Amino acid sequence: MAMKRIAILVASALMLASFGAQPSAEEGIFTQGEFFVGCNYWAKNAGMYMWSQWRPDVVEKEIGELAKHGVTVMRVFPLWSDFQPLTGVCAAGGSYKRFLQNNRPLSNPAGVDDEMVRRFRFMCDVAERNGIKLIVGLVTGWMSGRQFVPVVFEEKNVLIDAEAIMWQTRFVKYFVSALKDHKAIAAWDYGNECNCMGRTSQAQFYNWMDIIGSAIRLTDPTRPVVSGMHGLSTEESARAPIRLNGELADILCTHPYSFYVSGCGKEAFNTMRTELHPTAESLLYADLGGKPCFVEEIGNLGTSCNSESRTAAGMRCTMFSAWANDLKGCLWWCNSDQEVLDFPPYTDTANERELGMLRQDYSPKPVMLEMHAFQKFRKSLPFRKLPPRRTDAVIVVPERSAGWIPGFGAYLLARQAGFDPRFAGAEMELPESGFYIMCSSENNMSYSYPAQKRVFEKARAGATVLIVYAAGSRFTALRQQAGLEVDYSSRSPIERTFELFASPGRKMSCGDSGTCRLIARECEVLAKTTAGEPVFTRFKYGKGTVLVCNSPIDRQTIARTDVLTGTQVQPYYLLFREAMKIAGVKRVAAKGDCPWVGLTEHPAADGSTIVMAINFEPRALSCPVALDGRLGRVWRGEVKADRIDLPPNECALFEVVRTK
């Protein structure tokens, strides 16, 4: 008996050790500094019905064409309703006495169709022969606004129904076990936007992710698990917050379609808001979730929304920006146009029919040629990996209210001003920095008192803190911490016109949903309205500095269309640039007054700095620049010691060599 107990204990320990061995998120296709391009894949002949309308000849030819044009990674989907075709004997009241498989006895305890698994393996074999790695979306029960679940679950919420979850778990274990030996598979994915499959509380969604994630890892502890979700929130109380996904997934992802994300899609596809949206959203996920992130789905929603030329130009900027920010990769939605398909969702909306990189005749679209050209350029470089970018500031976003809009606005203003930020959630410990930007409040509950204290303590310890103030902002001891007194607050909307003393003649106008009138007491006024009201102030607090901008320029950057593109923009970025100077931020490549060009700096091991400059405008620009060092090698673009000349939507990549 004693020996038997020891054997059981040893076996249990080995099982737990196997389950506890987490795969590294910085290996394989997700290696730091690397970058993959590819697509989400549904065979062109049948789209989501590719498994039931199986054409191996189409799969083989199409994947070969994708590989020929530079695709190295595909995200693929075993459609749940096809791979686990559960039917059943239904009793009165809708309960099932027993489950069947296509109205026949189950062929295995998981109810999985083995023929579908064989078809999936064939696709994996084709991918491997073509050098393509696969991310497999396991529970694919939601696709393009439509449910694809086994018929027995069509009237159930599959995220909370115990029976549905039991069968999902069985499917995941069976499928992963059957295919985990295949070398083409790089990662498992929970499924396609599973947070859209039903309404849940946060606890219910946590439990679903934990159950499915555990089933994956118990069966295959060697591969990372990708979130696969869409539209996560900064809010602590949200149904699917970023932090929860960071806890339960190894890799995070974004699906930054400009028309489907709040505050986006307000200008052309090849302008700053749209081009930096994937970068900003992915960095927000990575910084708050604490896991690497990549752009898992991106697209132009077809020629009914964007021309092919604008799409290719915008995608060029998006890819270079994502690579510069170590976002691992970018997958287009999807592989081929599907205008020939005659079932929903392809018959419901034009947006679903022309999303491909390839046309139906296998000819590549400009966006595919651009993605291939990007990969060819990367391979031509003398270095394989881009060193991590340098960051100069921390954008603090609220976690008691929605933080995406002000966070995105602050990020865009920072890039316009000439520095590179990262994100942090207000309700957790803040990363160390000499410069913090606290986003404007949506209401008086946006920031807890401990969150406010943490930010002001950073200033007391020596940092520069910029508070973007709004009518809904409420701060305790503002007089003691910022040298400002609140005169009154009201619900009356206001439009302020003001200018920064350091930039005379550069007037700007900013609205707010309410009015908060501040009186400057012990602080220095750096900008004021035409009526003399302080808008931008500086106050010495402890060893540091507190700056207050009494106008929600972060939110208005997103609300307006005259801030980011065009020859005459609202110069809100001037306030961020002044804050950057006060914070003592020094850049190796300091750009002049050119808000349409973004620079990232990548310190190399030899002491030099690799600089990437991206022109986010669809017009040629000459960007003034001051280099702290000598101009070294130039790998892309027209770069001089004092300026960078950039064609429309183009990038420069060059080296600055230290001379001191």
Regions found by a protein language model. Name each.
Residues 222-228, 233-303:
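Glycoside hydrolase catalytic-domain groove-lining segments
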